[in-house]
Amino acid sequence: STPIKSSAASDVYKRQPYVVVFYVVNKCTWLYQYCRGSTVVDRLMVLLMNYPLAFKKLLPSMKLKSLVAGTIAAVGIWAVVYFKGKNGKKFRQGEEYGSARWGNEKDIAPFIDPVFENNILLTQTERLTMNSRPKKPKYARNKNVIVIGGSGSGKTRFYVKPQLMQMPDNVSFVVTDPKGTIIVECGKMLARGTPKKDKNGKILRDKNGRVVMAPYKIKVLNTINFAKSMHYNPFHYIRSEKDILKLVNTIMVNTKGEGEKSSEDFWTKAERLLYCALIGYIYYEAPEEEQNFSTLLEFINASETREEDEEFKNAVDLLFEELERDEPNHFAVRQYKKYKLAAGKTAKSILISCGARLAPFDIAELRELTSYDEMELDMIGDQRTALFIVISDTDDTFNFVVAMMYSQLFNLLCDRADDVHHGRLPYHVRILCDEFANIGQIPKFDKLIATIRSREISASIILQSQSQLKTIYKDAAETITGNCDTMLFLGGKESTTLKEISETLGKETIDLYNTSDTRGQSRSYGLNYQKTGKELMSRDELAVMDGNKCILQLRGVRPFYSDKFDITKHKRYKQLSDYDKKNEFHVEEYMKHQMEVRLDPEEQFDLYMYEGSELEKQSNSENEGTEHVT
């Protein structure tokens, strides 16, 4: 109803001038009939002298001549205005060559949440609300962010850390941590958490009056030092044959086979068949404790082939034959039969390529890391969690493990949102992908980033230059950037990035002042003022941008040229190790503290209990001090 009323009021306002013309001419025509004079000029002079008499009565005259004269005058004025406007020139003074300008406080105000913690911190003065459904839908923006900054521009300090320091009540974090410094500097703050609140937003206290805290559950995958990592088993998250195909695809995309043949289409398809068959068998037939990469390696090692004996059957062949007798249409059997169509020599080449692709799992530490699972990836959207993924910024040997985790994470969270939570996770999951180019390729990421918004998932893609994204995702890079409503540029000098940013900032119109000095027989001077267009910020200006400044572009809003966020002004800065080394987070101690003994109700085992000086005595006699626990 409000828009209709507003439109009607606007129409009335536009018609007012013509109503006034009709009224004035109507009243003057009525008075003119009573004016005496020998000529028209005399009568008009009398009319002007007695002009106020026409308006003694407010209502217009209803005589025919007065009505006709008023109507003709109003229509005539309307026609003049209409045709003049239709044929008139369109001027946009000050915007002849472009209307670009920097945004201000008024431009960003509708996008900021009044509760400071419920915002994404972008610059010192600009923030974006975490609320995905604001009161006015026109201010809704997705929370996907592209952060671009060269080495040393402060991507971690000015963007990643401020997000973690916010610690909103209903947000979980997944953080890529190059070198493993972020968890050390911010982990203690997250493990402490924030005051727990009730439904009304009131802080809860225990019986002693102390504030009840809501800590983050810390998870760590460390591909630099496996001893500081929790266990991650990709097999644990297989729920169906569809998940098997996704896992195999991730392995194939992020690892390399052996020799020239491994890159050919036939060989990769053959490898995929074997992986699907073996992983399918392990998932459906192997006990839970054997569902891991170690078992997969054992299967490949046992898949012996003999070129001279096509009838030879290895141990794996016998297992699949037995399974085929019981379930002829089993997924693993169907895949394995296709693989077995290859001749002995071809099968041997396939096995060599598979072995080379999984060569990193020959390392005992990696097999141990993937032997069972502690990550609970599917529960990150159900509980307050901070998952740190530590990767090396110099060696990408184990980055395929990280790519596997991210691929499974996105799919698991989307499936859980749809199947359990009616399309929206209770905790918004913010994925902060620092050094995104080092992670590897996440399959179908261009499609995932377009659909995760509605499930309460967002991704911050942090790069050194836009060309890094194009190198990995090729043509899909533009789709990925197009699905990020926010772009934050912290500085850099890569030419392609500077060119694209300069173009998207647009052009402004500036005044140009020229002088001329002509010398000849008679000397003359000239001054010339004109307008021209100039980039809001040219490539060379972007390249020498102040180190404390950044550029923020939010969809549908003018760009902002602002100071980078100063973390020392944040109220939780004192909880970081940046402020005090005592706040450093020790991962090993936390992992020991979090260890839980999981008991099987039907399993019996011996529990040995030792106390102080009795330790040496107890070690010499196994049966003393033993309790039988059920």
Stretch-by-stretch model annotation:
Residues 22, 89, 136-457, 472, ...:
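P-loop NTPase motor domains
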Residues 24-35, 78-99:
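Juxtamembrane/interface segments at transmembrane-helix termini
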Residues 105-136:
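N-terminal pre-Walker A segment at the start of P-loop NTPase domains
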Residues 63-87:
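Alpha-helical membrane-embedded segments
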Residues 449-551:
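Conserved ATP-driven motor cores of ASCE-family P-loop NTPases powering translocation/secretion/packaging/pilus
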Residues 2-9, 13:
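Single conserved hydrophobic/aromatic residue that forms the stacking wall/gate
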Residues 24-60:
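Membrane-interfacial helical/loop segments at transmembrane boundaries in membrane proteins
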Residues 11-27:
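Canonical alpha-helical transmembrane segments of integral membrane proteins
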